[in-house]
């Protein structure tokens, strides 16, 4: 040869063959002058270049000689021209001489084929075994002629297939060549990259067979016109989106290039040659197709000829046989060798459906198009030449890009071939079934995608990934599995086992039943309360052949699954991600034995849980650094539990205590152990502490100088000399003698000049010197952060002043600069940093949770558990400790527990939260209570069976008998407790003695603490308010008094209630005087004997000397000291119940407890129920709630929420005499007009002109400087209405309008039969101020206790 190229081949068999070829194993003697071929290991692309550069030189033999022209390296296609002759002769057959032509083509044009043919028509064929020397200029042979049988000589080298496994093909070609008339021109069209995978076999010399490979070439008959594929186009097909410029040799990217279009065009050119085939003149072309993309991850690179020769053996393509292992086959799907006997036994009992509509004969498929009556002739490997007619067929649901045609290679049909007597346990799916994914896939080249869909394996669900069987397969993307098993309950069987009753190979077509946006149907999944997972499956759609339903069953099915079982690693479900597993693991498997606060948790159980979590931190699936920090954090929380919530002793505690008994010693040991463990593992180097020290000789000189200075008594100079010479020991001694300031300064100088920045010793020295700002200077804290464990340990073990600020700063630096949230929280816990509600400035919300980086997901179960452990450790030292910002996270944790099905634990958490928030009084706390109560009620209802709960059934029964209950009290804000609390504050501000009222309000339990459960309409309990002054008397018929103060008549006569709320009337009133009422009357006997009996004559009279009311026959008590004057800062409030100002009455007098209405409540609303507790009562009236009936008027209750009511100043409507049994409290209202205020002001001035005294009721002390004033007389009978009469004391300030002084009202009681218009008279002068005698002859009210205001 003129020149030799370096062939880079990977196949060991090819290399051995050519080594023998060079060693004259197959050559004559003249071959010794030929240059040896060198073979190096290289890539496939280098192999292709070497083969492309091979050409014949045409300057040796003239017109009839063979010329090898060496193509340029820049050409993308080798220029091949031949004028030599090769031949093959066997005794068994007479073969006419045939000219072998090598078509010469380059990247720019295709040469005329006829011209090349004319040059080689006269070539003669040599005999077998002879050589046709194609020599160069020196006459040395360049090309060797080898018998075709030599390629198959060494069968043991190539697994029984010989070199390249081409011998069988050409032997059969030679056997059938005698029947071919005319000349057969062998055209080699080398398009694009000849070598595309590791299994390609390339021959050199006259055997320019272009590397025939089953997935890269096809045997086709070329028409007489001679159609050839442009090689540059093949290169462009190989790299979609790029275009090759032959003139410049550069690649250019093409926008919008579609690989599918290139594949389609190339396919049309290659398949169009099959339509018109001439029987007498046929060209055998080895068309090398270009591969667009190779699918990665092949099972194994095997010899391709072995598989081609097994096409007609009746076995699937994923079964690879090897002659060296008879009776065994390699399963490319299972990736293992299996016995052929086991497959035959399984295939005899398995009947599978045929997935094709096209008959495959002898293992070969034919390419079928829509052209009728077209014939294709394919050379069979079994030495047969078959001619068969293409069959017409319809394409259903085809929307692909293959020009409405199927394609296959020489081995595999356009669809799955399946002999009737052979069954497959795992069906193969090829290009036919892929093409039925209309619109859902993209086939990037012309080869059949021999991908196999695995059946369901044990412990898996859903379609497994498609495993390609060979290297050179198309890159196809499909949206769903191709073949499924209908087995839902037979997952425990082996994949190799024949599933007779459940096997179904019917293909799944997602194009059927799709939605408008081309989405396939799927099952609906929803979460249910209590850890349930609900799955609804539609059996009517295209899912009926999948594993989600059984074939032939219509309708839908709903399945309720237990979420805990699904997540716990059931064999029927695929495992979710690690994050999901950690979430459910914390809730279900590693949940706290809580609630810790308010629960009954033993110390052993708690320590066991901590040990399990510490062991989990050391597991392999957790990051090492994070696991190390979590382990340290949990150990710190355990120390906190051991020392009752303390991680450090208070500053200045007893130093004589043993170091081992303190919590800071335990914390220091923890950090020391972590540092030691890090040094042993090699990730924490030993830190250096000291800087460079002066030499020893210099130290000796400095010491002598300091000694001389001290001997002369110059301490300051000696101290300065010792500091400059780094003689810190004597310097500290001298500084201690000079004073604390010198000592602190010397320690600071030593830390800054001798110790390395960031070292723990330097940190401690600066803290001792009282310089915390120097510990972490700005911009140089990285060295301290590197040793943050040691620094934190030394600060913790040695308490100094303001060291907590340094620890907090260290945590902030770790969080902001290093992003170590766990390390930062360790610092915050040691510094005893308070927990804060969620905000941008909060440092500590949950232990170990980054609420800055993950504001929506930081409330994880493990973070809540760690925070609860810290709260529990605090309660061990202080049982009254409440971590208030943590309570809402407990409610969130209870919801998490309810989601996974742990309802009982979630209910306990709700109850614990309600108990913790029992004493809190704020708006957010009330909201948390509502959330916890709502979840608890929902859990209780769920546990009782939902709507079939016994409580609800009984409630419905009572409602059907008695009717619906009255509507619930209406609240303007929807929160009775909040309204009650706010009302207490408002009423306390209105009182002159607000201190006593506030004291009593703090002692009063709210309405929610003492609930009275009643049957509600829905079976739930309604909370009634606390017991009032006295208990209701069910044995007596209540007096229904009618008043018009709270009701107005509409024009149509309908009564309109003006009150904002009503008192729920007793349900027993619905029965009248029924049997049930009489029974209750016997249970609760009448208390009429306890009522006061008024006599015919009043026992009290007004004493002019004492200026007060006294009782006849009773010696008056001694004069008491005058009370101190009232506070002057309390504003004056003058109120009256004017009906023209009803809006103010509603705003100021509406109590928030929901038990009585604004304005004057009607007796019909108050008499049957329980009167409410006065919100502004003090400790002297507390006995009314204890069941003791008050005999005298409560003069210590001030303000609108008094137990008793006083008559109004004036009334706009004539009231009706009231006959109620109890005194109903009411709130004060402002005066209606200025005339009444002026009248009261005038009376107050008259009262203050004389001596002022107070006559109180017997047994109750009365103030001596208080004055009385008479109410404005009313022309009608008195009615109980609220009134606050303000009487100025001495020393009081000015009032609202400037001329009415501030005063204090006092009320007393009088025993009388009735009160008429002449009961009280306005005073005429200050000296004659006294009430007129009460009229005892009137009997309008009978023997009722009336409230009289003096």
Swiss-Prot record:
Protein keywords: Endoplasmic reticulum, ER-Golgi transport, Golgi apparatus, Phosphoprotein, Protein transport, Transport
GO cellular component labels: endoplasmic reticulum exit site; Golgi stack
Biased composition (Low complexity): 1150-1168, 1317-1343
Region annotation Disordered: where it falls in the sequence: 26-45, 73-97, 964-1063, 1118-1216, 1235-1350
Subcellular location: Golgi apparatus, Golgi stack; Endoplasmic reticulum
Disruption phenotype: No visible phenotype under normal growth conditions, but dry seeds of mutant plants accumulate the precursors of the two major storage proteins albumin 2S and globulin 12S.
Compositionally biased region (Polar residues): 970-1002, 1195-1210, 1289-1316
Biased composition annotated in UniProt, kind: Basic and acidic residues: 35-45
Phosphoserine modification, residue list: 43
The organism's place on the tree of life at top rank: Eukaryota
Gene Ontology biological process: intracellular transport; protein transport; vesicle-mediated transport
Role this protein plays: Required for efficient protein export from the endoplasmic reticulum (ER) to the Golgi by regulating COPII coat dynamics at the ER. Functions as a scaffold and regulator of COPII coat assembly at ER exit sites.
Similarity-based family: Belongs to the SEC16 family.
Protein name: Protein transport protein SEC16A homolog
Organism, as annotated: Arabidopsis thaliana (Mouse-ear cress)
Name of the encoding gene: MAG5
């Amino acid at each position: 040869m003129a020149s030799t190229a370096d062939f880079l081949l990977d196949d060991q068999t090819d290399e051995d063959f050519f080594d023998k070829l060079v060693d004259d194993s197959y050559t004559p003697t003249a071959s010794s002058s030929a240059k040896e071929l060198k073979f190096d290991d290289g890539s496939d692309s280098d192999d292709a270049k070497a083969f492309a550069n091979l050409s014949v030189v045409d300057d040796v033999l003239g017109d009839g000689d063979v010329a090898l022209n060496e193509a340029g390296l820049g050409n993308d296609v080798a220029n091949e021209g031949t004028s030599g002759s090769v031949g093959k002769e066997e005794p068994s057959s007479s073969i006419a001489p045939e000219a072998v032509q090598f078509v010469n083509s380059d990247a720019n044009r295709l040469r005329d084929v006829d011209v090349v043919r004319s040059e080689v028509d006269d070539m003669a064929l040599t005999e077998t075994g002879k050589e046709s020397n194609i020599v160069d200029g020196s006459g040395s042979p360049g090309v060797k002629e080898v018998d075709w049988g030599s390629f198959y000589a060494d069968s043991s080298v190539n697994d029984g297939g010989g070199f390249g496994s081409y011998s069988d093909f050409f032997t059969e070609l030679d056997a059938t060549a005698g029947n071919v008339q005319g000349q057969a021109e062998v055209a080699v069209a080398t398009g694009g990259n000849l070598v595309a995978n590791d299994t390609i076999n390339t021959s050199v010399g006259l055997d320019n067979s272009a590397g025939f490979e089953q997935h890269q070439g096809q045997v086709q008959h070329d028409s007489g016109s001679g159609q050839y594929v442009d090689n540059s186009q093949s290169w462009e097909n190989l790299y979609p989106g790029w275009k090759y410029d032959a003139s410049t040799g550069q690649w250019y990217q093409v926008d919008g290039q579609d690989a599918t279009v290139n594949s389609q065009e190339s396919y049309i050119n290659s398949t169009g040659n099959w339509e018109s085939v001439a029987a007498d003149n046929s060209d055998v072309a080895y068309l090398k197709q270009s591969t667009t993309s190779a699918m990665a991850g092949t099972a194994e690179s095997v010899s391709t000829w072995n598989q081609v020769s097994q096409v007609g053996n009746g076995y699937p393509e994923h079964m690879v046989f090897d002659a060296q292992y008879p009776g065994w086959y390699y399963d490319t799907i299972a990736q293992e060798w299996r016995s052929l006997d086991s497959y035959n036994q399984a295939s005899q009992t398995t009947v599978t459906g045929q997935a094709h509509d096209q008959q495959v004969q002898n293992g070969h498929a034919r390419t079928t198009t829509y052209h009728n009556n077209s014939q294709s002739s394919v050379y069979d490997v079994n030495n047969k030449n078959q001619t068969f007619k293409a069959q017409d067929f319809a394409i259903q649901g085809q929307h692909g890009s293959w020009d409405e045609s199927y394609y296959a290679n020489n081995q595999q049909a356009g669809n799955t071939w399946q002999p009737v007597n052979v069954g497959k346990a795992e069906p193969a799916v090829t290009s036919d079934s892929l093409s039925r994914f209309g619109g859902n896939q993209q086939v990037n080249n012309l080869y059949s995608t021999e991908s196999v869909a695995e059946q369901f394996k044990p412990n898996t669900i859903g379609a497994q990934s498609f495993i390609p069987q060979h290297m050179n397969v198309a890159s196809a993307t499909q949206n769903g599995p191709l073949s499924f098993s209908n087995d839902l309950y037979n997952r425990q069987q082996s994949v190799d086992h024949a599933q007779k009753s459940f096997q179904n190979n019917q293909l799944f077509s997602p194009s059927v039943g799709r939605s408008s946006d081309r989405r396939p149907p799927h099952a609906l999944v929803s979460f249910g309360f209590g850890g349930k997972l609900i799955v609804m499956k539609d059996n009517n759609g295209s899912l009926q052949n999948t594993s989600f339903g059984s074939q032939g069953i219509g309708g839908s099915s709903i399945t309720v699954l237990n979420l805990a079982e699904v997540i716990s690693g059931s064999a029927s479900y695929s495992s979710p991600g690690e994050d999901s597993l950690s979430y459910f693991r914390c809730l279900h498997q590693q949940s706290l034995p809580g609630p810790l606060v308010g629960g009954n948790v033993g110390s052993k159980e708690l320590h066991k849980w901590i040990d399990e979590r510490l062991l989990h931190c050391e597991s392999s699936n957790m990051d090492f650094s994070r696991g190390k920090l979590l382990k340290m954090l949990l150990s710190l929380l355990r120390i906190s539990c051991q020392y009752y919530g303390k991680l450090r002793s208070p500053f200045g505690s007893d130093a004589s205590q043993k170091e081992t008994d303190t919590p800071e010693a335990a914390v220091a040991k923890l950090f020391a152990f972590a540092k030691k463990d890090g040094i042993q593992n090699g990730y924490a180097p030993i830190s250096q502490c000291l800087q460079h020290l002066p030499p020893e000789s210099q130290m000796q000189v400095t010491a002598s100088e300091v000694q001389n200075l001290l001997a002369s008594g110059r301490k300051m100079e000696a101290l300065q000399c010792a500091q400059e010479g780094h003689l810190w020991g004597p310097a500290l001694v001298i500084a201690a003698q000079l004073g604390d300031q010198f000592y602190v300064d010397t320690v600071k100088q030593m830390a800054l000049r001798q110790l390395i920045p960031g070292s723990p010793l330097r940190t401690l020295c600066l803290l001792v010197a009282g310089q915390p700002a120097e510990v972490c200077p700005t911009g140089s804290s990285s060295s301290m952060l590197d040793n943050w464990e040691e620094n934190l340990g030394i600060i913790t073990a040695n308490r100094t002043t303001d060291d907590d600020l340094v620890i907090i700063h260290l945590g902030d630096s770790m969080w902001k600069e290093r992003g170590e949230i766990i390390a930062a929280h360790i610092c915050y816990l040691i510094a005893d940093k308070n927990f804060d509600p969620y905000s941008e400035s909060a440092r500590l919300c949950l232990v170990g949770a980054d609420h800055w980086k993950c504001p929506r997901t930081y409330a994880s179960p493990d973070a809540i558990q760690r925070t609860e452990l810290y709260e529990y450790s605090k309660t061990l030292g202080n049982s009254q400790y409440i971590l208030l910002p943590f309570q809402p996270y407990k409610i969130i944790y209870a919801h998490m527990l309810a989601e996974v099905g742990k309802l009982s634990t979630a209910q306990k958490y709700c109850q614990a939260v309600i108990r913790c928030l029992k004493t809190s009084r704020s708006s957010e706390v009330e909201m948390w209570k509502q959330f916890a109560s709502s979840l608890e009620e929902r859990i209780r209802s769920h546990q009782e069976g939902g709507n079939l709960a016994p409580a609800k059934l009984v409630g419905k029964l009572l409602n059907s008998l008695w009717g619906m209950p009255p509507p619930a009290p209406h609240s303007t804000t929807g929160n009775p407790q909040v309204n009650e609390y706010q009302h207490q504050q408002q009423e306390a501000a209105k009182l002159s003695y607000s201190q006593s009222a506030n004291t009593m309000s703090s002692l009063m339990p709210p309405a929610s603490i003492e609930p009275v459960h009643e049957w509600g309409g829905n079976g739930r309990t309604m909370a009634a308010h606390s017991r009032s002054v006295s208990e209701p008397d069910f044995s007596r018929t209540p007096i229904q008094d009618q008043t018009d103060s709270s009701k107005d008549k509409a024009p149509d006569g309908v009564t309109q209630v003006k009150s904002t709320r009503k008192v729920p009337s007793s349900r027993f009133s619905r029965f009248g005087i029924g049997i049930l009422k009489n029974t209750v009357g016997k249970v609760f006997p009448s208390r009429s004997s306890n009522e006061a009996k008024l006599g015919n004559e009043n026992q009290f009279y007004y004493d002019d000397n004492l200026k007060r009311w006294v009782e006849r026959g009773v010696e008056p008590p001694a004069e008491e000291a005058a009370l101190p004057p009232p506070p002057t800062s309390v504003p004056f409030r003058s109120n009256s119940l004017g009906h023209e100002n009803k809006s103010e009455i509603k705003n100021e007098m509406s109590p928030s407890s929901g038990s009585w209405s604004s304005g004057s409540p009607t007796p019909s609303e108050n008499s049957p129920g329980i009167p409410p507790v006065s919100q502004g009562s003090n400790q002297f009236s507390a006995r009314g709630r204890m069941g003791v009936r008050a005999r005298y008027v409560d003069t210590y209750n001030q303000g609108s929420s008094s137990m008793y009511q006083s008559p109004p100043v004036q009334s706009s409507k004539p009231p009706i005499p009231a006959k109620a049994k109890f005194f109903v409290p009411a709130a004060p209202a402002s005066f209606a007009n200025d005339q009444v205020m002026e009248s009261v002001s005038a009376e107050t001035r008259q009262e203050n002109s004389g001596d002022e005294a107070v006559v109180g009721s017997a047994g109750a002390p009365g103030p001596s400087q208080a004055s009385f004033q008479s109410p404005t007389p009313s022309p009608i009978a008195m009615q109980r209405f609220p009134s606050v009469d303000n009487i100025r004391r001495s020393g009081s300030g000015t009032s609202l309008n400037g001329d009415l002084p501030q005063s204090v009202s006092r009320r007393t009681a009088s025993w009388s039969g009735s009160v008429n218009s002449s009961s009280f008279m306005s005073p005429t002068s200050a000296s004659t101020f006294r009430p007129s005698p009460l009229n005892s002859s009137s009997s309008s009210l009978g023997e009722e206790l009336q409230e009289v205001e003096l």
